[in-house]
């Protein structure tokens, strides 16, 4: 879906993100657009199911994966109507840096952003929330 790439480009334009993606979570459960070569490009339907699933506690204990990358859930407000976001942090494997990730939920898509090293999760959360709200208000 080439039209969705412009949304990813918009999320990336201020330089604080290393990756962004728009991912369908309803009937078209796959990555619609993502930063080329990134982890988000490989997000699977099973990983989407964990994020949107009914079990809102298990991932706090067990973590989750995004494109095969292990992550910890910091805060889950994905189904809180006034918020619709989730804050995640990648886990270090082999000593590499960890990164903040924010997810925003619109009506049919999830917005993913991953910050560069040292980028605070609060700014990423606001970015994911704003894009998800825009898409929700636009019928997505």
Swiss-Prot record:
Organism superkingdom: Eukaryota
Residue numbers of N-acetylalanine PTMs: 2
Cellular localisation: Cytoplasm, Cytoskeleton
Keyword terms, alphabetized: Acetylation, Actin-binding, Cytoplasm, Cytoskeleton
CDD domains reported in the protein's UniProt record: PROF
PANTHER family for this protein: PROFILIN (PTHR13936), PROFILIN-2 (PTHR13936:SF15)
Quaternary structure (record): Occurs in many kinds of cells as a complex with monomeric actin in a 1:1 ratio. Interacts with PFN2. Interacts with ACTMAP (via N-terminus); the interaction may facilitate efficient cleavage of the acetylated N-terminus of immature actin by ACTMAP.
Function (record text): Binds to actin and affects the structure of the cytoskeleton. At high concentrations, profilin prevents the polymerization of actin, whereas it enhances it at low concentrations. By binding to PIP2, it inhibits the formation of IP3 and DG.
The protein's name in its UniProt record: Profilin-2
Species this protein is from: Rattus norvegicus (Rat)
Gene behind this protein: Pfn2
């Amino acid at each position: 879906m080439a039209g969705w790439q412009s949304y990813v480009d918009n999320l990336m334009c201020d330089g604080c993100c290393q990756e962004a993606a728009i991912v369908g979570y309803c009937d078209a459960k796959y990555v619609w657009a993502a930063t080329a070569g990134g982890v988000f490009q490989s997000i699977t339907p099973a990983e989407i199911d964990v994020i949107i699933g009914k079990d809102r506690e298990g991932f706090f204990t067990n973590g989750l994966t995004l494109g095969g990358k292990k992550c910890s859930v910091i805060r889950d407000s994905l189904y809180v109507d006034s918020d619709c976001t989730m804050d995640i942090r990648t886990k270090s494997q082999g000593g590499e840096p960890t990164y903040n990730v924010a997810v925003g939920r619109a009506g049919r898509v999830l917005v993913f952003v991953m910050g560069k090293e040292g980028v605070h999760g609060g700014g990423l959360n606001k970015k994911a929330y704003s894009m998800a709200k825009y898409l929700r208000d636009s019928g997505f």
